[in-house]
């Protein structure tokens, strides 16, 4: 199952705010034996959001989307999701109950707009302030505020997607190879990549610096058995080529 993340907001792309969602998604997935396959950053542009969501809905991927589900003029995610699905946004009855429970006599039509989601959506409970997110077609839409979205994401992972936890044993291993150009290891990398499609190879070169030798961090991440076998071959071949290496 392929998992993606969409992080939305002009404030991210302009640098006014630093994204914190990407690292947290990776952390929460890895703790459950899952992995993020792709991520996309988008601004507050309804047409671009609609096109991106149409593509991701068509892919069948599981997608976590952060930001843009409010009701100010720069919030487009709810409408873009509906447009991508060829439907409309409607007030969700469970969302209405949550919003009325939150605001009581101070409930207004504007606040109820926070519960308008694409037709056919389910709500995602928000333990912080009861203003829910929504899910539809394997897509899960959260507010942009981490204090709200991260507990909501954990709820989704542990209730809606619990069957995917540790479905495959995953691991990551790497070695540090000293004073080797990447070109000298390309044949090895290509051979390992072809032999172990259940895992992904990574090569992170460093030019070194004061007190640090030039090196490459060479490793694998993916299914545990494939990682173990691939790393054994990598260590043996690096040694055969005459390069010094150390465990990461």
Mark where each language-model region is.
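Proline/glycine-rich low-complexity loops and linkers
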Residues: 48-51, 75-164
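Glycine-rich phosphate/diphosphate-binding loop of Rossmann-like nucleotide-binding domains
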Residues: 1-39, 44, 228
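Conserved short beta-strand edge segments in small beta-sheet-based binding/regulatory domains
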Residues: 201, 237-248
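Glycine-rich beta-strand-to-loop/alpha-helix junction loops that act as flexible
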Residues: 8-10, 65-73, 204, 221-223
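N-terminal small/polar loop signature for handling phosphorylated ligands or for N-terminal nucleophile
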Residues: 26-84
């Amino acid at each position: 199952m392929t998992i993606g993340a969409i992080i939305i907001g002009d404030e991210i792309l302009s640098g006014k705010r630093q994204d914190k969602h990407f690292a947290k998604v990776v952390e929460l997935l890895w703790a459950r034996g899952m992995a993020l396959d792709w991520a996309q950053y988008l601004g507050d542009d309804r047409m671009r959001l609609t096109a991106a969501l149409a593509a991701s809905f068509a892919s069948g991927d599981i997608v976590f989307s952060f930001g843009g589900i409010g009701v100010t003029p720069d919030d487009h995610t709810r409408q873009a999701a509906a447009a991508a699905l060829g439907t409309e946004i409607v007030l969700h009855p469970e969302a209405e109950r949550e919003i009325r429970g939150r605001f009581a006599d101070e409930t207004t039509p504007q606040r109820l707009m926070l519960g308008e989601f694409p037709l056919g959506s389910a709500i995602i409970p928000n333990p912080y302030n009861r203003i829910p997110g929504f899910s539809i077609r394997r897509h899960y839409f959260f507010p942009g505020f981490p204090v709200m979205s991260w507990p909501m994401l954990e709820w989704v992972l542990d209730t809606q997607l619990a069957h995917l936890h540790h479905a495959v044993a995953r691991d990551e291993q790497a070695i540090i190879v000293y004073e080797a150009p990447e070109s000298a290891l390309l044949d090895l990398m290509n051979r390992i990549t072809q032999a172990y499609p259940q895992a992904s190879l990574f090569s992170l070169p460093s030019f070194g610096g004061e007190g640090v030798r030039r090196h490459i961090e060479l490793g694998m991440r993916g299914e545990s058995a494939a990682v173990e076998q691939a790393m054994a071959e990598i260590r043996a071949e690096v040694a055969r080529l005459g390069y010094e290496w150390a465990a990461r």
